[in-house]
Design a protein with these regions (language model features):
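C-terminal structural segments of small proteins and small subunits
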Residues: 127, 131-132, 138-139
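A broadly conserved detector of short glycine/acidic/proline-rich loop/turn motifs that flank catalytic sites
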Residues: 9, 22, 48, 83, ...
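N-terminal low-complexity, intrinsically disordered tails enriched in Ser/Pro/Gly
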Residues: 146-148
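Conserved binding/recognition cores within well-folded domains
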Residues: 26-125, 129
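N-terminal regulatory/sensing modules of transcriptional regulators
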Residues: 1-28
């Protein structure tokens, strides 16, 4: 693989172009890595405090009433964004799994499927689980395939 960097002071935005004969796993990994480096810095709220957590610590985001909560292994923090806003800015390792939940698929260790077509994601080192609806089952499967 060849790498070339061109400096152009006239550019207003950085552009990355990858030329290849085919889309390989190596190129897909590189694309994923580049996308994850621009992950947003979210503010999480609990009580009167503001917290700045690493997105990798978040297991899932879910709605509860009119509020959105981000769950870690032990805590839950309020996020002042809507799920569709989060979905558009979160890295690719977050996947919509139901109408009310976005899960960090890197933190999940199993997906148990039921006969009705729904499922449950279990996370490492916690009792917390999330429901996967039938509607989002194929999206989750595709995202897991792309991540592994």
């Amino acid at each position: 693989m060849k790498l070339r960097i061109e400096i152009d002071s006239g550019l207003t935005e950085t552009e990355i172009v990858i030329k290849a004969a085919a889309l390989t796993d190596e190129i897909a990994d590189l694309q994923r890595l580049l996308q994850e480096t621009k992950a947003p810095r979210l503010i999480f709220y609990k009580g009167t405090g503001e917290y700045y957590l690493d997105l990798a610590e978040i297991l899932f985001f879910e709605t509860e009433g009119s509020k959105i909560y981000a769950h870690t292994q032990k805590e839950a923090y309020e996020v002042r964004l809507k799920l569709y806003e989060l979905e558009s800015i979160l890295p690719r390792y977050f996947s919509r799994v139901s109408k009310s939940t976005i899960a960090n698929i890197r933190q999940g260790y199993s997906v148990d499927k039921s006969f009705s077509g729904t499922g449950t994601i279990s996370f490492y080192q916690t009792h917390k689980e999330v429901h996967v609806s039938r509607h989002y089952q194929s999206l989750l499967k595709e995202n897991l395939r792309n991540m592994r």
